[in-house]
């Protein structure tokens, strides 16, 4: 049962000793903006030396997988492979490739509310995008991702496509907002998806955390035993809920969005799926449970 206990000492050594692997969120866990969380690169290196598998799960849909891998390298996270990185953009591309499979002349196109990184991920999966050069096939899906150019006219166009009951509505994630370095907030994909849902009267299929579909994408590529895997994240409503839904041990790090007070409030309210099993001040604290 999740009790939001501080992970340290003997409990930390026991939890890490039993774990085969760790899933990490990225923003607010490994870095904040362009600043890495102190000790994060060293932790990943020590986990690798200890034989622990590490994978990374992000709701950020702004970067295609190769670009995300470059970001890891640029920030000083050495030795990681692109195959270890799972974003909501990648998972959306996989889902749409599955759902829109068929003859080339019948596969249809995806209308994208999102940036170039998301579009690149879709193209890499062999999907056709509405508005790309050439004759536009019928739009068979609307995909909502993080879109800094979101507008009333684009919303109207998306709703026009969604009047077709066979047109899919997919969202990369439901994160309502994201923190900025100055303490302010910027709207997240969840805010944009809510606008499309309200205007179209349709319900989006969400692929990112806390949807188990992201874990399904991971298990297609890696052998992962959720009972022996840690999910480490900074957001209770996405990372921790995702971990619970997929049967993992959950660890909240306090370097990002959610606070210990929020976790304790969920515990008091009996909303245990939003309560982590453990918390740490920073993921660097996990190094105390690893042998040198």
UniProtKB/Swiss-Prot annotation:
Cofactor: binding comment: Divalent metal ions. Mg(2+) is the most effective.
E.C. number: 3.1.3.16, 3.1.3.74
Enzyme class, first EC level, given as a word: hydrolase
A GO biological process held by the record: positive regulation of actin filament depolymerization
Residue sites binding Mg(2+) per the record: 25, 27, 234
Cofactor: Mg(2+)
UniProt subcellular location: Cytoplasm, Cytosol; Cytoplasm, Cytoskeleton; Cell projection, Ruffle membrane; Cell projection, Lamellipodium membrane
Gene Ontology MF: a single term: pyridoxal phosphatase activity
Alphabetical list of CDD domains matching this protein: HAD_Pase_UmpH-like
Active site: 25 (nucleophile), 27 (proton donor)
Record family assignment: Belongs to the HAD-like hydrolase superfamily.
Protein name per the record: Chronophin
Organism per entry: Mus musculus (Mouse)
